[in-house]
Amino acid sequence: MKILLLGDYSNVHATLALGLRALGHKVTLASDGDTWKNYPRDIDLKRPSLGKLPSIVYFLHLLRTFRQFKNYDVVQLINPCFLPLKAERIRPFYHFLRRHNRKVFLGAFGMDHYWVEAGLDCKTFRYSDFNIGNKVRKSVDNEIWIRDWLYGEKGKLNKEIAENCAPIRPPPGQG
């Protein structure tokens, strides 16, 4: 099977790639190496800078690189924000992947709309980033995550991908 793993957190996709290759699958891992952790990958998607000119150059690099991401049997996204871009700029890359590949799966790794929502209900998890027991935790980081993932573009992108991709994949042992 031809498999594309896009993005990485905590070496999850790098480790998965090793296991899938050992089983005889053809696997390509494209990521930024989880930024400073610099995990191994086949195709480097590291963004060198947030400046205007480097961002334009990076965007052009992505356009060229994504031409290679066609005709895979399976594409797994680490998270809705599988590229180091604003959510609204990721959307066309996601649609490209859907058009040119057999199945696209969304991994439930890292922060996302559903994790924030579940943490705030104070029922799904006894403890999370957002709650301790039945009390919501207040912090600056949480306020940013709530704004971005429940009401912002990240949340909109997350819901769109979740509604039209193949089934969402939770981390091993959590689903």
Model-derived segments and their meaning:
Residues 1-43, 99-101:
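N-terminal subdomain of nucleotide-sugar transferases
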Residues 2-6, 66-89, 103-107, 168:
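Short N-terminal targeting/anchoring amphipathic segment
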Residues 12-14, 36-40, 83-86, 112-117, ...:
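Short catalytic/ligand-binding loop motif for oxyanion handling, primarily in non-cytosolic enzymes
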Residues 30, 74-76, 94-139:
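Active-site proximal beta-strand in glycosyltransferases
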Residues 40-51, 175:
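Active-site regions of enzymes building and remodeling cell-envelope glycoconjugates
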Residues 48-68:
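Glycine-rich, highly charged phosphate/nucleotide-binding loops
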Residues 63-70, 92-99, 128-166:
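Membrane-proximal helix-turn-helix segments that form the acceptor-binding/catalytic region
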